[in-house]
Every structure is written in structure tokens, then in C-alpha cells.
Amino acid sequence: SVPEGHSNDSLESSLMTLRESLRNGTNVGIEGCYHIVNREKVFLVHHVYTMKNHQTSQMTDSQLQDFLALCKKLRVRPLDLFMQDETLWSEFYAPDVLKKAVMLYCLSPQNKGDLLHIGLVTSMGEGKDHLIERVVQPLVPVGVAGSGKMSTIAGLFGAMSGDDLSSIELGLIPKMNHERLAVSEFQTWDSMVFGELMNVMANGKFEMQKGQLDISRPGCVNMMFLGNPPKSWDDETHNNLDMLESFGDYTYQILSRLTLIFTQMSISGPDAEQLIEEKIMDAMNGKFDDPEVKREMNMWRVFGREYLRKVSLIRPQMSAEVKGLIRSTYHEQIKNTKAFEKAFLERSKKDMRKYQEYTNLCRAFARLDGSPTVEWTHIAEAKDIMEISMKTLMENFPLDELAAGMT
């Protein structure tokens, strides 16, 4: 019999909602009540419904324009505002170039052309996990993958227990579709896991096969790889490119898919040590537990989250002049560096994926500014951050000195 006097049509509709949830990874809400019968809970379901899509920003078009107008009046860019230590970075010290990389990563990719992956390889104890915990997770949704054998292909992608579509258990990647994934201690992963990531990182989707089933699932996620150099690495006999051996058998394929790669033993530099120690002691003293401090930090995080969701939907347009400037800066300045040749052209004389990533980087900076068009300032920022990223592949300089123009 149909519970609660529901018709067969309403029951069928509820079952369809549950089936679509299993297929697409959407969240469902269930309303009803339960009674205790013989020490067991018996649930009586009233309604089954698809929950609201939380990827949609609550910021309206007029609110966005008012905010951008205020920034223009005060002669401050939105990106500069979100990089202030008093806003989103109260609990973590980082040089500006790393802050920019994190803000780019926090955009929500809408399709494979928006994907922006970052690699950060540094020495132990540099606070990479703290970066995710104190900056990224409070700001935007991010899935954190396990390290070593705790991270499995089934856990990342999903698994099928039979030949029926309803038996699919979705993994972390499809659950975080249009969001982000952080990989902590990636150097402990089995190389086979990296191999399975190739299609996801490039195309934002993956295929699963079992029995007679061959299905495709979305996995449009920005990825950040945080890890340490391989055991064999040392300052005396290796250069920074050797750090990338942490990616194992698929090093060159992963490199081709990473928009930005930072490889250095220090992400901050010696002058920052005192500031980092100050942050540690402030946290231990409970500074960030103060109600007023927490209220202000939460305000910035909520506003930043809605702003990032809103601007992620912008499709910045490129004029003919801008297209020419992107081409010239890429071919004349980015591609002609020694680091680019060593990292990306060892296996092939062409890597069109890097050109696509550079163009996407220009568009991403436009989004962070809330701009409907790509301007020369966005190209300049994209060029600078990519040059700094590649410079760390060849030279062991701290990021704050690199960002200041050290050559």
C-alpha cells in the first residue's frame, strides 16, 4: 500500500527523485516523522524533494554592480581587497603571489575551459594543510582527498556494485562537480591514481565501465596538489625540476595539466618567519576565537563566497586587440623561457594546452575583477604569475622576493 495516502504517481515521482540523486550526485531532502516500534525507528515519509543548488550565488546583479562601483570610487580592486591580511587571510601568512593563486583556485569552474589546477611542492612544515583549513575551507566548498593508500580510485571517482545504474556510489570528484579538490601529501599516492586523473583534469569528466555498463560522469573540479619533494631530492645534486618527480610515472602529463606550479623549499622567505610565528602565537592565545573577530572574519568569508560564485559565471570577452596581446606575450615571453622548455617541451615540441591555460588565466583574473571583458591589466597579471611559477622550477628563490621583481 502507498504510505500516507499518497497516489501511485506521487510515489513514482519520489522514486524518480531518488534515482536522479544517485545518478547526478544531487542532495535530496526528506520530510516526515518516525515512531519507535519494538525498539526500532519506523520512518513515515511525507515528501522527497531535490534540495536547493547551493552553487548559485545569493548576490544579485545590482548588488554586484554596486560593489564594483564602490571599489572603483575607492580606487581599489576586488582582488586586492580579498588579499588583505585583515579580510580572508587573518589566520595565515602568505606572499601576494600565493594569495592570487589561491583566489584563482577558488573560482568555480563551469566547464572544462575554466579548469585551473595548481601544484605546490615545498619542504615539510610550510603550512600547506593549514592553508586549506584556515583559508580555503571557510571560504568555498572544497573536498580534501586522503593521502597514501587512504586515497583510492573508487573513493575518488565512484564504484558500481552491479550492472544496474542505481548501484552506482559516487566518489569525491563527482560530488565536488563545479567546485574544488585539494590533494594533501600527493607524493604518497600510487601512480595508478594519477593515471586515472588524466581525463578529469583535462576534460572535466570521466568514464566508468562495469559489466555491460559504460557511463560518463561530470567531474569539473579545480585541483590543488600540495606535497613535498621526493626522498631523493637534495640541494646539492638536484634542481627544482627534480621535485616534480613526486608525481611519479605521470609527471609530464600532470605538468601539462597544471596551470601554475610552485616548487621551492620555502613559500615565504626568511623575512616572513617572525610574521608566521606571530600568527601561530595569536592562534594559541585564542585571538581568532574572540566573538567580534570571528564575526568580522565570517562576514568577509560569506561575502567572498557569494562574490566568487557570482563572478565565476561571467564569460569575459576578448577583443581582437586583446587576443593579439595574449598571443604575443605567450609566444614572446612565456614560451621562450628555459623553464618552459625544460618542463613542457621535453616530450613534445608543442603544448597547446599551456596556451589554453594561459588564456584561461587571463580570463580568470578578469572574473576576479568582476569584469565582462579581458583587459591588458589582466594579461599582465597572468603573465607575471605564470613567469613567477616557472621561475621557481629553475631557481630556489622565496616567492615574496620573486614577486618583488628579483631576477
Predicted regions and their residues:
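N-terminal secretory signal sequences
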Residues: 1-16, 27-29, 328, 332, ...
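Charged/polar, low-hydrophobicity segments characteristic of intrinsically disordered regions
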Residues: 126-140, 387-407
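OB-fold and OB-like single-stranded nucleic-acid-recognition modules
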Residues: 1-79, 191-192
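Basic, amphipathic alpha-helical bundle interface domains used for macromolecular binding and assembly
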Residues: 234-236, 244, 253-255, 261, ...
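Conserved ASCE/P-loop NTPase catalytic core
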Residues: 1, 78-309
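Active-site-adjacent bridging/hinge elements
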Residues: 3-7, 72-81, 197, 322-338
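Structured beta-strand/turn binding interfaces of compact recognition modules in eukaryotic regulators
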Residues: 31-33, 184, 226, 377
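A cross-taxa feature marking solvent-exposed loop/turn segments within ectodomains of secreted
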Residues: 37-39, 113, 372
